[in-house]
Amino acid sequence: MKKILLLAILALGIGLQAFAQEDAIQRFFSKYMEDERFSRVYISPKMMQMAGGFLKNNAEGDKDAEQLGALIGKIKGIRILSSEEVNGKSLYTEAMSTLSRNRYEELMDVQDKGSSLKFMIREEGGLIRELTMISGGEKSFSLISMLGSFTYEDLNMLAEKTNIPGMDQYSKGSKGPK
C-alpha cells in the first residue's frame, strides 16, 4: 500500500512539474498579452490541422506537398510575442529565466552586436515537443513557441519549405543531429 501511495505521489509530482513549466511560459505570454507595445499571434492546433489537411488534399501527386501537409498537421500550436519598442535585453533575460534548464536543451545560441538569439527545445521520448526561439536586442524582443511532436528531420523540413516565423533563423544554424 505504501508503494502504491509513493508511486501515486511521485507521478503527481512529475505531472505538476510539467504543468508548472508550461504554466511559466504561458504566464510570460499572458503578462504581456495586453501590453500595446507587443504584437501577439496565436495559431491554434485546429488551424494547423486545417492547413496541413488543405496541403495534403491539394497536393495532386506532389510528394513534397503531401509530406509538408502531414508535417504541418503535427504542429499543435504557435505562439508569437514581439515588439520593436521595448528593452529587449531585459525581456530576453526574463524569458530565459522562465525556461527550466533541466527541461529545455539549448539548440543554438547567437550573440551579435548587442542582440541575443537562442533556440531551445523540449524533448520527450525521442521527439521534440516544443521549439522555442527567444531573441532580444536594444529595442526589440521576440518569443516564438511552436508545440507539437517533431523529429529533427521535421524541423529541418519546416525550416527549408515554410515561412513559419523564426524558422529562417533556425535554417541558418543547427540542422540537428544526423
Task: Give the positions of each predicted feature.
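Bacterial Sec-dependent N-terminal signal peptides
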Residues: 1-24
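Short Gly/Thr-rich strand-loop-strand
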Residues: 98-123, 170-176
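Extracytoplasmic
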Residues: 35-38, 73-75, 102, 112-116, ...
